[in-house]
Amino acid sequence: MKISKTKTPKLVLIAGPCVIESLDNLRGIAIKLQPLANNERLDFYFKASFDKANRTSLESYRGPGLEKGLEMLQAIKDEFGYKILTDVHESYQVSIAVKVADILQIPAFLCRQTDLIVEVSQTNAIINIKKGQFMSPKDMQYSVLKALKTRDKNIQNPTYENALANGVWLCERGSSFGYGNLVVDMRSLKIMREFAPVIFDATHSVQMPGGANGKSSGESSFAPILARAAAAVGVDGLFAETHIDPKNALSDGANMLKPNELESLVTDMLKIQNLF
């Protein structure tokens, strides 16, 4: 896979539900995503979490867990031929998750966790590091460098080119804006793209953390607007959570797009890419 700094031959698309609810639910979403997965202009990855370890409330659904969750992701991989992204929260999960996942994701709250970044970087998986809501875009270069130096001890400074070559990506998902809200500073896309490929997370960027009495809320209607803006600034890919029935999703339903909405958004982003 090649990602160009100025005009992406293939837009990376990472899409799927927030959390694994059931195999039937995963299959239903995977079927709906087939038109996007088969689009020759996209480099598609199916995503889902086996455990949402940072839910606001202890009572909130977390997922099926590591073993059962990975079994279900492997089933999707086998049936549809999709490449897989899943996130890891603890170092011990890495050696198990990498048997299924093509991309291992570092959650935003853990983007400075050296041991976790190093553990993932010792695998052959692409590492997608989410920018913490509390982090400046410039400071994300140090998380990138942790991964790069683990994979190539001769690297002294992170660049887009050496991060691309070593499979180290960053993901923008918004910054804290007071209590219970996020805002996207589009300058961060340009800043971080100086030292790594950048994926824009459109759906988590419209999250309202803790805004619904023990649950996070969100405003999914703004996700396409921000994604189109990100495409105009220049990004290497789109991360978007999708669900057939967002209102009844077990996690982050308020942020998610329906598959047909996602398909329309991706069409817009590809058109915008053609302008530059």
Curated annotation (Swiss-Prot):
One example GO MF annotation: 3-deoxy-8-phosphooctulonate synthase activity
CC per GO annotation: cytoplasm
Enzyme superclass (EC): transferase
Catalysed transformations (reactions): D-arabinose 5-phosphate + phosphoenolpyruvate + H2O = 3-deoxy-alpha-D-manno-2-octulosonate-8-phosphate + phosphate
InterPro entries, per database record: Aldolase_TIM (IPR013785), DAHP1/KDSA (IPR006218), KDO8P_synthase (IPR006269)
Chief place of localization: cytoplasm
EC numbers: 2.5.1.55
Pathway field: Carbohydrate biosynthesis; 3-deoxy-D-manno-octulosonate biosynthesis; 3-deoxy-D-manno-octulosonate from D-ribulose 5-phosphate: step 2/3; Bacterial outer membrane biogenesis; lipopolysaccharide biosynthesis
Pfam name, any one: DAHP_synth_1
Subcellular location(s) per record: Cytoplasm
Coiled-coil residues: none
GO BP: keto-3-deoxy-D-manno-octulosonic acid biosynthetic process
SUPFAM superfamilies named in the record: Aldolase (SSF51569)
Record's keyword terms, sorted: Cytoplasm, Lipopolysaccharide biosynthesis, Transferase
Recorded family membership: Belongs to the KdsA family.
Xref: PANTHER family: PHOSPHO-2-DEHYDRO-3-DEOXYHEPTONATE ALDOLASE (PTHR21057)
Protein name, UniProt field: 2-dehydro-3-deoxyphosphooctonate aldolase
Species this protein is from: Helicobacter acinonychis (strain Sheeba)
